């Protein structure tokens, strides 16, 4: 049976089956990841001109991810550490999705290639 490409279905499997059952991550990790997607999904829906329920995995591409990270820093005034934590949550999902929907590996790989941001060195 082929796993659906819709983002909401994959996220549901990611949170319920993968994070909780298979990985057995802490409830704090689940909450942090959940909070990331509560911010990211409305942003992605607006950017894609779609409703959240109609988003596809392919909508989560590198260009949209870069715009989201910029939004976190510039409009939400998040620190680099927070930006990187949000990116880590999205990467965890993308790694899961790459196994569940290998047909979308080219899009997923490009999104996974978005780097973390390094903190600026403070000069005395």
Language model features with spans:
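Blade/loop signatures of beta-propeller domains
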Residues: 1-5
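Gly/serine-rich nucleotide phosphate-binding loop at the start of the catalytic core
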Residues: 7-10, 32
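N-terminal core-binding DNA-recognition domain of tyrosine recombinases/integrases
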Residues: 13-28, 34, 38-122
């Amino acid at each position: 049976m082929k796993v659906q490409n819709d983002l909401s279905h994959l996220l549901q499997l990611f949170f319920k089956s993968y994070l909780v059952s298979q990985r057995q991550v802490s409830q704090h990790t689940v909450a942090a990841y959940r909070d990331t997607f509560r911010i990211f999904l409305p942003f992605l829906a607006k950017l894609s001109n779609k409703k959240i329920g109609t988003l596809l995995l392919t909508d989560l591409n590198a260009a949209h991810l870069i715009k989201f990270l910029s939004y976190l820093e510039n409009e939400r005034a998040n620190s680099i550490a927070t930006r990187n934590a949000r990116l880590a949550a999205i990467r965890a999902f993308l790694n899961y999705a790459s196994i569940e929907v290998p047909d979308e590996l080219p899009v997923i790989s490009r999104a996974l290639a978005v780097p973390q941001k390094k903190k600026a060195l403070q000069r005395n």
